[in-house]
Swiss-Prot record:
Catalyzes the formation of N(4)-acetylcytidine (ac(4)C) at the wobble position of elongator tRNA(Met), using acetate and ATP as substrates. First activates an acetate ion to form acetyladenylate (Ac-AMP) and then transfers the acetyl group to tRNA to form ac(4)C34. Keywords: ATP-binding, Cytoplasm, Ligase, Nucleotide-binding, RNA-binding, tRNA processing, tRNA-binding. GO terms for cellular component: cytoplasm. GO terms for biological process: tRNA modification. It comes from Lacticaseibacillus casei (strain BL23) (Lactobacillus casei). This is tRNA(Met) cytidine acetate ligase. Its main location: cytoplasm. It is found in: Cytoplasm.
């Protein structure tokens, strides 16, 4: 069966995502669309507005055939690490083609990735503490490969290409033109809105009928929503009670940020105020949110490394076509396939220990078990 894969967050699923899945299937002439989707937490450093099962169900009803979870250890990372986690998971699923939407589909992403593979991406170019890492990285890209575009989906596509280049058997890259408004912009264009706009409408209890598939309007209205508003008290408690040595073990903790975070947390009443207190020219808001989330979830560098060394394929759901594909490849997959979560997987030394640790907050807030005993949606 011809397969095409996409890496997504679907935070939440909307008409632009339905278009993207249809384009991927059409352009790749694929029988099966496989999606590696972020679990309950997303790359911008916050809980997804709906849990992973709600978002997987929406995707399966609107173009995806198989949805596999991108665990928190890969989902809540900077672009290159996020891309590596998603690309390697798709490759492990036996996917032939990697499709992604971009502002610049005309670019030869594989060629650019090869140029960057020989460029020096460390050293003196990253020692300007008055600029973010991303700004300095863009300058290195421009010097090494003549890359001047900085559009977010272009940069993410480039991260996909670099991760794909590192595979033993690289997938075919299939960039296609994005439709509608930019990823983090707010607004609506041709009945396609950014995920940010959809979240804004949902949280304000405004109608999303024009910007999500019809069947999802009532479905979304019945679902528990999640945000930093619910998580901030947990962050505050962690920062007020954890030892500094404990905080230093958290993934992506660097350069004394544990001091800055613990010094500023007492006076902050919400996440927005806290981020303004700790913000500096060196770090983007997304970088700081990711670190704050890692602290809240106690996601240590050790947990991230263990997840990379012992990857799993946790299936969230499939259509009949997806099930047929899964049955045809399950004995040939490079990684263990998980279709039912047992208690031993969630134990402190289990293969889903970090996922379970992170998802327990979602279960506590929303009252819906996220892992134990759950089977794939069908």
């Amino acid at each position: 069966m011809q397969t095409v894969g996409m890496i997504a967050e679907f935070n939440p699923f909307h008409t632009g995502h339905a278009y993207a899945l249809a384009q991927a299937r059409k352009l790749a002439q694929a029988d099966v669309v496989v999606v590696v989707m972020s679990g309950n937490y997303v790359q911008r450093g916050e809980p997804a507005i709906f849990d992973k099962w709600v978002r997987a169900q929406a995707a399966l009803q609107h173009g995806a055939d198989l949805v596999v979870e991108l665990p928190v250890t890969g989902a809540v990372q900077a672009a290159d690490q996020f891309a590596e986690a998603g690309v390697t998971a798709l490759a492990a699923m036996g996917v032939n083609t990697l499709a992604f939407g971009t502002e610049h589909p005309e670019v030869a992403y594989a060629d650019l990735a090869e140029k960057l593979a020989t460029a020096a991406l460390t050293g003196d170019g990253f020692r300007d503490y008055t600029q973010t890492y991303a700004t300095q990285l863009n300058a290195v890209y421009a010097k090494a490969a003549g890359i001047t575009q900085t559009d977010p989906n272009f940069m993410l596509g480039l991260s996909y290409a670099k991760a794909n280049l590192a595979l033993k058997r690289p997938m075919t890259l299939l960039p296609f033109a994005r439709r509608g408004i930019g990823h983090d912009e707010v607004g609506i264009q041709a009945n396609i809105a950014s995920a940010s706009t959809v979240r804004e409408y949902l949280r304000a209890d405004q109608s999303v009928a024009a910007i999500v598939p019809t069947e999802l309007v009532d479905f979304y209205a019945k679902q528990q929503q999640y945000s930093w508003a619910q998580f901030f008290p947990w962050l505050k408690y962690r920062l007020q009670t954890a030892e500094l040595n404990e905080l230093r073990l958290v993934a992506t903790m660097a350069e004394g940020l544990e001091y800055r975070f613990t010094q500023k947390i007492d006076d902050a009443q919400d996440m927005t105020a806290f981020l303004k207190q700790v913000k500096s020219k060196r770090y983007t808001y997304a970088r700081l949110r990711r670190l704050a989330l890692a602290i809240t979830l106690n996601m240590t560098a050790t947990a991230v490394n263990q997840a990379r060394q012992h990857p799993q394929l946790h299936v969230l759901g499939f259509t009949p076509t997806g099930r047929q594909y899964l049955n045809s490849v399950k004995h040939d997959l490079d990684w263990p396939l998980l279709t039912k979560v047992s208690a031993d997987m969630l134990a402190p030394d289990g293969v889903l220990a970090m996922t379970h640790r992170a998802d327990r907050l979602i279960t506590t807030i929303g009252g819906v078990e996220q892992n134990y005993g759950r089977r794939p949606l069908m």
